[in-house]
Amino acid sequence: MTMNLIQLLKGKWRFKMIISIWAMTKEGLIGKDNQMPWHIKEEFQHFRRQTLHKTLIMGKNTFFSLPKVFDKRKMYVLSHEKDFKIDHPDVEVIYDYKDLLKEYANNDKKDIYVAGGLYVYQQLIPLSDILIVSIVKGSYEGNKYLSVDFSNFVQYKQPEIYDQFSVYYYKKKDQKNSI
């Protein structure tokens, strides 16, 4: 991604925040064959609480891995296939995340939650203002690993500790707004 796009998105055009939210093991495992390698009810509930009544962006494979379309959320599904369509009132297919970010740029009331998968996280975590990261305890098998450079982020509140995972909250270091 070019620095010009980042400057454009973070400068003149401004939406409230880009928030990336995901669960991973301490090794960075996030998926196995387009599914989550774990089924932790409390972690799913945490995701639901964080994203309810919000706008989400995710990749096509992530969308198809969902048990159903999430209720009470606007969902944008990123696809490189120009003829790909989804017929649902709360779901819109987009072909370039930059267009979506430009559309939301002047909206200072809406956050955009990045909800996976690997490619979408790799593109949008560097643009994110907030990271909400669940670290899942235990060992799991999988084939999708996310490597995140946390050097531009700082933990801004105490982790939430659960039996099977812990949630960490980070904000971008140069963020001027208090959280």
Curated annotation (Swiss-Prot):
Record pathway: Cofactor biosynthesis; tetrahydrofolate biosynthesis; 5,6,7,8-tetrahydrofolate from 7,8-dihydrofolate: step 1/1
Any matching Pfam family: DHFR_1
Keywords: NADP, One-carbon metabolism, Oxidoreductase
EC main group: oxidoreductase
Residues reported in the UniProt entry to bind NADP(+): 22-23, 30-35, 59-62, 78-81, 115-120
Enzyme Commission number(s): 1.5.1.3
Gene: folA
Transmembrane segments: none
Binding site for substrate: 21-23, 43, 48, 73, 134
Residues of the DHFR domain: 17-179
InterPro entries (UniProt xref): DHFR (IPR012259), DHFR-like_dom_sf (IPR024072), DHFR_CS (IPR017925), DHFR_dom (IPR001796)
A biological process term (GO) from this entry: one-carbon metabolic process
GO molecular function list: dihydrofolate reductase activity; NADP binding
Catalytic activity field: (6S)-5,6,7,8-tetrahydrofolate + NADP(+) = 7,8-dihydrofolate + NADPH + H(+)
NADP keyword on record: yes
Record protein name field: Dihydrofolate reductase
Superkingdom, taxonomy of origin: Bacteria
Family, similarity comment: Belongs to the dihydrofolate reductase family.
Assigned GO CC terms: cytosol
